[in-house]
Structures are given as C-alpha cells and as structure tokens.
Amino acid sequence: MLNIRLFIFALFASLAAAPAVAQEAQTLDEKVNAAFAAATGPFVNFIFAPFPGTIFPWIVMWLVVGATIFTLYFGFVQFKFFGHAIALVKGDYSDPNDAGEVSHFQALATALSGTVGLGNIAGVAVAVGIGGPGATFWMILAGLMGMASKFTECTLGVKYRNEYPDGTVSGGPMYYMKKGFEELGLPGGKFLAILFSIFCILGSLGGGNMFQANQAHAQIVNITGEFPGWITGVIFAGIVFAVIVGGVKSIARVTEKIVPFMGILYVGAALVVLIVEYDKIGWAFGQIFEGAFSGLGVAGGLVGALIQGFKRAAFSNEAGVGSAAIAHSAVRTKEPITEGFVSLLEPFIDTVVICTMTALVITISGQLITDPETGRFVLNEAGTAITTIDGNTGVALTSAAFATAFSWFPYVLAVAVILFAFSTMISWSYYGLKAWTYLFGEGKAQELTFKIIFCVFIVIGAAASLGPVIDFSDAAIFAMAVVNITALYFLMRVVRGELTSYSSRMKKGEIRKYVG
C-alpha cells in the first residue's frame, strides 16, 4: 500500500507541475505536453479505441451493454418503480433518525450536480452536429437504459457503506468491491477497489476539476473580454473550498439549492426558444425519428447517429461509472434499495430531459444548414459533420441556437455554464475525497490535504493550457466504468435479493410512509 501511495503522490505532482512549468516558455510547454502525451497516450488510445471491426468506441459499448443487461436482469426496474422513486425524493418514506448524513433529495441533487454540466450543452451540440437530430433518439434510449445501471451501483453503495460513530459515512464502489466480494467469497475485490480509487482521484482532478475551471473561465472571458485565468482560478478555488471544507452536508446544502435553480434556468430558457419556434416542434421531432432510423444526410449515416447518441448519453449521465454511488451512499436510510430507486432518476433528468431540450433547441433554431431542394443536411467537405451557420460547434453552436429567440440569451447560457462547472467541481471533489481517504485512511488531516490539492488544481485548470492532461483524466473516468461494471456483474445478484425482498414487503403493505 505504501508503494501505491508514493506512486499516487508522484503522479499528482507531475500533473500539477506540467501546466505550471509550461507557463515559463512556449518551447518548454511543447516539450512537457509532448512528454506527457507520449507517456499517457497508449492508455488514452486504449480506453477510447473502437471495437474491432467497427467505428463504435468499445468503452461506450461496454456501458450500453451493461445498462441493457441490468435493465433485463431487474425486469425494467426503472419503469416499474419510477413513481415510487419520486415519492422517496419527496420524503414520503424518509425517517430522519435513520443512519446517514443527507436526505434522498440532497443525495440526488449532489449526484446530479456532478453529471449535469458541460456535456449537456457542448457535448449534445457535438453529437447533433455530427449525427444529426437522429442522435437524440439514441441518446434518449441510452439514457433510459442507463437508469438501471445507476440503480444497481447506488443500491450497492448504500448496502456496503461504512457507518461511523460520529454519524458520518463513507461508501461507493471501492467499498462494495472490497466488502461485497469478501461477503460472497470472491477474490480480487480489494485490488479492484484500489484500482477504482486511483482512477477516481485522477478523474476528479481532471475532468471533474481542471476542465470545468478552464471552460468556466472561457465563458467569463466571452462576457467580460480579456480576464486573467489565474484570478478566475483563485476566485473559484476560494468559493469551492468554502463549500467543500464543511463536508458532504455542506455540499448537499449548496447543491439542493443550486441544482434546481440551474435546471430551471436552463430548461426555462430552452422552453422560451421552443415556444417562440413552436411551429417547428413537430418538424423537429420528425427529424429526430427519421434521422434515428434512416441516417440520411448525416455524417456516418444511421450508424453515425446511433454512435453519437449513445456516446453522448454515456459521457453525460455517467451511468455505470460508479461516481454517483459515492454521493448516494451518504443518504439517511435503512433500506439500501430505496436509494437505488432515487438514483435512477438521474439519467432521466440529465439525458432524457436536459440533453433532449438542448438537441431540440439546436434542431429548430436553423443553425444546421439544409439543402433547400432535398431538405437534407449539408455536410462539410470532409463529410465528417453537418455544416452550421458561421461554422459554430460545441458551446458556440448551442449559444447561437439560443440567440435565435433573444439576442441576450447567450449571457443566460454563459451563467448556466459557469453554474454547471461550479456544481460539477464540488461534487467531484467529494468523489475524489472518498477515493483518497479509502487509500490513505480516514481523518481530518487526510481530508484537508486532498481538499487543498483539489483547489490548487482549480487554479491550474483555469490558468493553463491543458491538452493531454484532460485527455488522460477523461480516460481515467471511463476506466472507472471498466472496473465498476465488472464488479456489478458479480454483485448484481445481491441487488436482486434486495429488490425481491422490498417488492414483497411493499405488496404486503409493510413499506409505509413515514409519519413523524
């Protein structure tokens, strides 16, 4: 374990030093980036490589196949218990005396704040820009199936969590890998837990931190003009530290307010655009269904639309990655399965609602150029993407789409992006923290050490050119899914036992609403 700890410290030091040292000279910047890319490139290429004989990334296929298996294994649990999940979030069955630190709603808000982010804005724009509106259909389908993955991992997160005398808890994939495998007499659980924790820490510092700070700074620059990145980083680091220093209860108090606000802000803005362009909504849905099954006039045809939809859903809602199980494990409950029900709402809100709203706005806005004679989308010269007005992609495409309703809407979008980035950072700080304390032990000193490291990386992310560092951290996040889903296959029978027991007691009337 000591060697692992030394390795992790050395790796973090190199990650922090690379962008910082690169500020001294452009030639040194290039050398550092090239060296880091050469060292991490094989790992990144492996994670995002296509499945043999196809153009479908194997990691996306891994997530989709897992979601499909869990959907079938648990008898479409995401549809059968959807209503019950809403009742749980409302607090109808919540006993405040149960072990745990946060309510069902707070746990859901914390997990949602980690998934609802730039992927819903920039990622969907990329998916629709390449795969056309038809990608939206496959995105929704993947989101619906991903609900079963969230249900599985979050049930296990609560079942195998550690509960401490002071009322705090620690849970997540690393705990159910170790304790669950031991309970079933299976080998390898401890190894999987360590591997998952390493990937989780790397992902939290990269994709859950530096990338978010970098993109938030870009939006601030768009609004104000030139603005020093390090100042943005210091401001964000100070605000984030003020929130995370209080632990998961502090994070939950913030996310339970900011998540509904930013969700209403973004969805409300999208609804305004849809109302203004109401006469095009029917046409937009027609484009979605036609594009999903014909794929005509889009890059890659039908397969291209399917790949982009599945990829965006997987990258956006993180179903199967295991991160959400860390947040949900802090819930106050004596029934692990109840938090599994609550968690299945995440992919629905993130992908089926918010991502779909983004796709609809882009589709009806007229930003995707069509041939007036055929009505088909016009591809670029390389045939790799749909031509857009002014050549916009990513956040710029979504911003331009919103601006078709009101010219000042891009400012609303910029605020939404900044809020999404902030909420993602505070949630991923908790994920990384729990992985850190799993490896280095529980304690205030260990927790403070990670929180300081996390905030330092915020400044680096806002001020530096990230390049290969972000590619590596993104790969680390999806490497979490490889480890996590492997464990879920071995432990899903435990979840089915919990589901069978709870369903039986519900039918007998033994599961009653809480009356204080």
Protein language model features and the residues they cover:
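Membrane-interface loop-to-helix entry segments
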Residues: 3, 65, 73-86, 196, ...
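Extracellular/periplasmic helix-exit of transmembrane alpha-helices
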Residues: 153-166, 270-287, 300, 330-333, ...
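N-terminal alpha-helical transmembrane segments of multi-pass membrane transport
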Residues: 2-118, 128-133, 146, 489-516
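Flexible loop linkers connecting adjacent transmembrane helices
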Residues: 76-104, 126-128, 132-136, 148-187, ...
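Extracellular loop-to-transmembrane helix junctions
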Residues: 52-81, 129-167, 355-357, 409, ...
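Helix-loop-helix module between adjacent transmembrane segments
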Residues: 70-71, 113, 142-169, 178-214, ...
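Transmembrane alpha-helical segments of multi-pass small-molecule transport proteins
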Residues: 60-65, 140, 190-198, 222-246, ...
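Alpha-helical membrane segments and immediately flanking helix-loop junctions
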Residues: 97-130, 156-159, 165-180, 195, ...
